[in-house]
């Protein structure tokens, strides 16, 4: 519109700019109204896929004696992708809440489940070098990888379920957890077995029940905001 200045009356470029802005706003509103929760579903699906990839990459690093200096930067990059997707989902949840979408509560629960999974997947016992040594002493490499691969496979299934509006099927990983708990008992002096058994049991519970472990008031800041007119008066 600036290039039109001098070639036509002053009000015409301003009018074109205003109409373009109005069109952009109306198009975005219509697009969001048409698809409603689908953008959030896509973000949640990507979040679960990234959690699966992060879980596999983390336990590959800890159980296959790879060089932490080479493996850690890509792992941290995956972790950052997870954090970015969590922020994106949080923003989209606020948009759905403002529009009183009927799928909001279910998608909020899926997001809370993702937060719990992220916490238990990303937690670490020590630095990678120490954990690698402890894992080797406990002879738990194969069993830990088995648990991690089971979790990752389930997360990918859930990602597709979220994206394509499917209800999740039944899930359990009792055999995998049983093998891990057996190693934890056999090597009681080694913290790796007990640490892995506890966190994988929490992950398995979330994946089985599809319910968050912890109560979170994610929309607390939204609830504190005043409507426009009361806010202006105050």
Listing of model-derived features with the role each one plays in the protein:
Residues 1-29:
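Pore- and pathway-forming membrane helices of multi-pass small-molecule/ion transporters and channels
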Residues 31-234:
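Cytosolic regulatory and coupling regions of membrane transport/channel systems
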């Amino acid at each position: 519109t600036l290039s039109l200045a001098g070639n036509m009356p002053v009000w015409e470029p301003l009018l074109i700019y205003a109409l373009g802005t109005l069109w952009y706003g109306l198009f975005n509103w219509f697009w969001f109204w048409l698809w409603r929760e689908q953008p959030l579903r896509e973000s949640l699906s990507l979040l679960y896929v990234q959690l699966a990839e992060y879980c596999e990459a983390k336990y590959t690093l800890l159980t296959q004696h790879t060089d932490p200096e080479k493996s850690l930067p890509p792992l941290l990059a995956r972790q950052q992708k997870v954090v970015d997707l969590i922020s994106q989902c949080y923003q989209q949840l606020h948009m759905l809440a403002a529009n009183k979408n009927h799928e909001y509560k279910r998608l909020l629960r899926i997001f809370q489940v993702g937060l719990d999974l992220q916490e238990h997947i990303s937690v670490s016992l020590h630095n990678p070098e120490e954990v690698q040594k402890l894992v080797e002493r406990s002879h738990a490499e194969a069993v830990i990888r088995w648990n991690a691969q089971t979790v990752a496979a389930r997360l990918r299934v859930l990602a597709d379920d979220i994206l394509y509006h499917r209800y999740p099927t039944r899930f359990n990983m009792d055999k995998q957890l049983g093998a891990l708990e057996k190693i934890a008992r056999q090597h009681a002096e080694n913290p790796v077995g007990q640490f892995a058994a506890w966190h994988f049991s929490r992950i398995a519970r979330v994946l089985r029940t599809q319910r968050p472990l912890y109560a979170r008031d994610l929309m607390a800041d939204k609830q504190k905001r005043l409507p426009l007119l009361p806010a202006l008066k105050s």
